[in-house]
C-alpha cells in the first residue's frame, strides 16, 4: 500500500484540476483573489514578487511580497484555493535561491531583481 490512501489521492487530484501557470521565486506575479464584502463578491489584484514557493500537492502555497506606500506587505496564498481566481506572470526574475527572505531587509534599488533573458 502506498504512503497515501488512494481515496484521498483521488479527492486531491479532483481539487487540483485548476490550470496554474509555471512560476518560480523571483517572478513578478499578479494574483486575483475573490473578496467577499457583505453580500457582494469582487476580485482584488495583488501584484508583487514571489519570495517563496512550497510544493506539496493540494497543500501547495506561495508567498508574494510588495511594497505599498513604503510599507512591505507579504501575503501567502494556497495555490489550489477557490479564493485564488487567477495567477498572471508579469515578469521572470533571475535568482539563485529558492527562498528570497533576504529581500525583507533590502529597500529601494537594492531590492531589485534582474530579469531573466531567455
Curated annotation (Swiss-Prot):
Stored Pfam families: Ribosomal_L19 (PF01245)
Cross-referenced InterPro entries: Ribosomal_bL19, Ribosomal_bL19_sf, Translation_prot_SH3-like_sf
Top-level taxon of origin: Bacteria
SUPFAM superfamilies reported in the protein's UniProt record: Translation proteins SH3-like domain
The keyword Ribosomal protein is assigned to this record: yes
KW Endoplasmic reticulum (keyword) present: no
Gene Ontology MF term list: structural constituent of ribosome
CC terms in the record's Gene Ontology section: cytosolic large ribosomal subunit
Keywords: Ribonucleoprotein, Ribosomal protein
Protein purpose: This protein is located at the 30S-50S ribosomal subunit interface and may play a role in the structure and function of the aminoacyl-tRNA binding site.
PANTHER family listed in its UniProt record: LARGE RIBOSOMAL SUBUNIT PROTEIN BL19M, RIBOSOMAL PROTEIN L19
Family note: Belongs to the bacterial ribosomal protein bL19 family.
Protein name: Large ribosomal subunit protein bL19
Organism, as annotated: Hahella chejuensis (strain KCTC 2396)
Record gene name: rplS
Amino acid at each position: 500500500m502506498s504512503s497515501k490512501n488512494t481515496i484521498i489521492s483521488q479527492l486531491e487530484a479532483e481539487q487540483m484540476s485548476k490550470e496554474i501557470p509555471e512560476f518560480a521565486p523571483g517572478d513578478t506575479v499578479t494574483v486575483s483573489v475573490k473578496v467577499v464584502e457583505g453580500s457582494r463578491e469582487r476580485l482584488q489584484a495583488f501584484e508583487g514578487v514571489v519570495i517563496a514557493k512550497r510544493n506539496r500537492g493540494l497543500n501547495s502555497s506561495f508567498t508574494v511580497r510588495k511594497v505599498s506606500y513604503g510599507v512591505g506587505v507579504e501575503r501567502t496564498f494556497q495555490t489550489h484555493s477557490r479564493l485564488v481566481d487567477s495567477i498572471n506572470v508579469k515578469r521572470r526574475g533571475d535568482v539563485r535561491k529558492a527562498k528570497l527572505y533576504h529581500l525583507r531587509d533590502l529597500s529601494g534599488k537594492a531590492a531589485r531583481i534582474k530579469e531573466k533573458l531567455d
